[in-house]
């Protein structure tokens, strides 16, 4: 047996036929195939994400590994800035404000902010991500802490709130 075969990390479970057949299994990071597809985010993976969701995989399945305590596929897609995957997950009912467990308690918005991914941040806010001025992780750090240039995100949210409140009309029905 070659040393390369022994040293091959368990992360290559996707290429193993038995792992592909059992979509509920996890790799050494605690990730399912849905997590892997969301993290990679390319077109091929988007089709895999759709297939897994069509087969009944929970869109909010959490990863339980040493570095991914409670991360959902949406956390990983936001971290990578994969807008099409994020859109698919949200359409299927992903919790846009899901928090990781452990010390941080990050939302997908925190993940996108840490990566300074402006498109992902804008997409999450426009999709309804919770963005009060005091949104903090468990260390009391707001997304601004991880991305100092995020002030524009609060401005987008403020403009959205203003346009929503100004377009509020009351409907009356006449009998």
Mark where each language-model region is.
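Ankyrin repeat domain, specifically the short helix-to-loop turn at the C-terminus of the second helix
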Residues: 17-20, 50-58, 87-95, 122-130, ...
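Leucine-rich solenoid repeat scaffolds
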Residues: 125, 131-160
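Conserved ankyrin/ankyrin-like repeat signature
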Residues: 45-48, 84-85, 119-120, 152-155
